[in-house]
Structure formats: C-alpha cells, structure tokens
C-alpha cells in the first residue's frame, strides 16, 4: 500500500496544491513564482524518493514570504497526514551532507512535536529571488505543521547556494529514512506519537 495524499490550501494570498507519495519514487513537478525556492523544493522532494506535484499561485504578488510560508504549511500538513498513526516508522534519522565547501547536519524526529532549530552562518540576505529569512521560515513552518522535530546546522561552508542545497538534500534524505516502516509498533515509550 502506497502512502500518498493530495492537499489544497487556499487563502486570499495564495493557492497551494500538493500531491505527495512518500513510498514511490517517480516524477516530481514544482511550480511556484519563486525560482530559487522551486530549486530547493525539487531537491527536497527528490531526496525524499517521492512522487510529488507542487503548484503554488501567488494571488497578491507582495514578495516571496507568503509563497514560502503557505507551501511549508501545506507540505507539512500533507507529510503529517500521510504518515497516519505513524505505526512502525523508524521515527529518527539524520544525515551529514557535504556539497563542495559546505557541510550541513540535518536531524529529524517524527515525534509529533514540531520544534525546529536552524543555524546558518550565511553572509547573503537573498539568493536569487528568495530572502534567506524565508528559508528559516520554511523550516520552522514545515516542522510545526508536520510535527517533525527538526535540526539543521551548518558545520562549514561559505557558498550560500551550497549550504542551502545541502540543507534541503539532508532534510529530504532524513525524512525518507525516518518515515520508513521497519517495526510492528509505534516507536515510543508512551505507545503513541
């Protein structure tokens, strides 16, 4: 049985449509009005080994904030819902991703507690058409709405693109590993997540 979901979020600011299948690696389509964000989302979904379609319409064209935030909310909710009761999932995973000069640690716990800690040492305020502050916002919003405890820590790196791409690769790989069904029971001393 494949774990897949379609999710729609509509506000006066954006319309976000997401299809996500976390058990079958297939075609990935990403379309938002923020080009660098498209690159990061595609990277995340690719390294999750997923099949996915993300389509975002910006109804107000203020800036990149609402696009990033609403996408993170919707993707987080979709990931949480597709996991169901989380029975048998590995739950924990971490990766250390090198990308040229960059080295980034990403760790996740699918605990139901969406707390994030993101530590970058970046010198730029923007990359392409995306504000760096909205990368932080993506991770915190995704973490909160998915119920995934998330840590992203830049260990090394001077190139902003490399650091961010390594972060999204690491998140994708960690989410894939943590969501694999390996056990019969819920992996919690409490008996539920």
UniProtKB/Swiss-Prot annotation:
It catalyses: D-erythro-1-(imidazol-4-yl)glycerol 3-phosphate = 3-(imidazol-4-yl)-2-oxopropyl phosphate + H2O. Pfam families: IGPD. Keywords: Amino-acid biosynthesis, Cytoplasm, Histidine biosynthesis, Lyase. GO terms for molecular function: imidazoleglycerol-phosphate dehydratase activity. Gene3D superfamilies: Imidazole glycerol phosphate dehydratase, domain 1. It is found in: Cytoplasm. Belongs to the imidazoleglycerol-phosphate dehydratase family. This is Imidazoleglycerol-phosphate dehydratase.
């Amino acid at each position: 049985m494949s774990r897949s979901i379609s999710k729609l979020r509509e506000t006066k600011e954006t319309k976000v449509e997401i299809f996500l299948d976390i058990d079958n690696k297939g075609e990935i389509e990403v379309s938002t009005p923020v080009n660098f964000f498209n690159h990061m989302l595609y990277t995340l979904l690719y390294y999750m080994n997923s099949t996915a379609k993300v389509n975002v319409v910006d109804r107000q064209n203020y800036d990149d904030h609402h696009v990033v935030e609403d996408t993170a909310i919707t993707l987080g909710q979709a990931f949480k819902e597709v996991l169901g009761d989380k029975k048998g999932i590995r739950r924990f995973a971490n990766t250390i991703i090198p990308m040229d000069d960059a080295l980034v640690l990403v760790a996740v716990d699918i605990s139901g507690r969406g707390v994030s800690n993101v530590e970058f040492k970046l010198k730029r305020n923007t990359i392409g058409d995306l504000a760096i502050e909205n990368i932080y916002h993506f991770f915190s919003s995704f973490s909160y709405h998915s119920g995934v405890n998330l840590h992203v820590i830049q260990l090394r790196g001077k190139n902003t693109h490399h650091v961010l791409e390594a972060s999204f690769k690491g998140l994708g790989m960690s989410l894939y590993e943590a969501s694999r069904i390996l056990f019969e029971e819920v992996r919690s001393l409490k008996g539920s997540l």
